[in-house]
Amino acid sequence: MNKLAQLDHKYVWHPFTQMRDWLKREPIVIAEGKGAELRDVRGRKFLDANSSIWTNLHGHNHPKINSAIQRQLKKIAHSSALGLANEPASLLAEKLATVANGKLKKVFFSDDGSTALEAALKLACEFSRRTTKIKNPKFISLEGAYHGDTVGAVSLGHIDLFHKAYGGLLFKTDKVMSPYCYRCPFNRAKPERDDARNYRKCNWECVGKVEQKISVQKKKGNPYAAFVFEPLMQGAAGMIPQPKGWLNRVAKIARGCGALLIADEVMTGFGRTGKLFACHHENVQPDFLCVAKGMTGGYLPIAATLTTQKIFDAFLGEYHEFKTFFHGHSYTGNQLGAAASNAS
């Protein structure tokens, strides 16, 4: 076993990994990458088939992104966004607001997908309190949802393998049926058959379940503060696609019942579904758009939560009113990450 592998075994604790098994074998130690190819310290080549967990868009060692980071590094690597602005982050915010289309004109930067979702969750919660006077706003997300690993994001998740162990830390959220055409529960589709919608006329029973759940909550006088979803494709649940038309229908239902829309495009954003954002396929305009992963082309950790002027305005006020959004991170709006994102 080479020296680097020995150091890894001795000191490193890997994510989502049963370390008992990990320590039984020599790990693959990556030394460099080019395009879709990774090379380890022994010179062996590997295909980066999952794009380094859905982060890499243009290939490793892309000259344009390399140059952008190098140019920025000669100026400054990082300065705080707390009380200071910077050029790359300002330019990136403008680009994001432009390509997102619609009313998403305000950008809150953070570090990764979980923190982007966390910011949206806090903003939606406080916005709901201020506009409805409901003290404990409720949230709803889809069965099989995965939105990250911080406490708020885990509270919105519904995959027991990842989330059950932390039950005592979490706040309660509701879940609702997500569509699964391949194994549609309403027509007893057999696993070996094709998409259920191809051989039986669909009556959108899955949409009816969403409508029932959300409308019942509204009738209780405590409508959901927000409906949180992964648009078009649920990732960690098993790469489960949503049928055409489902997202548009449930978005209208949720909005009609007073819920804000939080679109988690951490995985689907930046062209993964054929359009820049998955919501664009169904003309869905969320109140919050959470992006990360591919934003830098897979280079550096930076994320963003896009929202509307209406949400932004709810946090404006005098200091004694305590309307400030008290949330942030040390590396919010980091110049190197923003420079990589602008190039990407």
Model regions: which residues?
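Conserved N-terminal phosphate-binding loop of PLP-dependent enzymes in the Aspartate aminotransferase
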Residues: 1-344
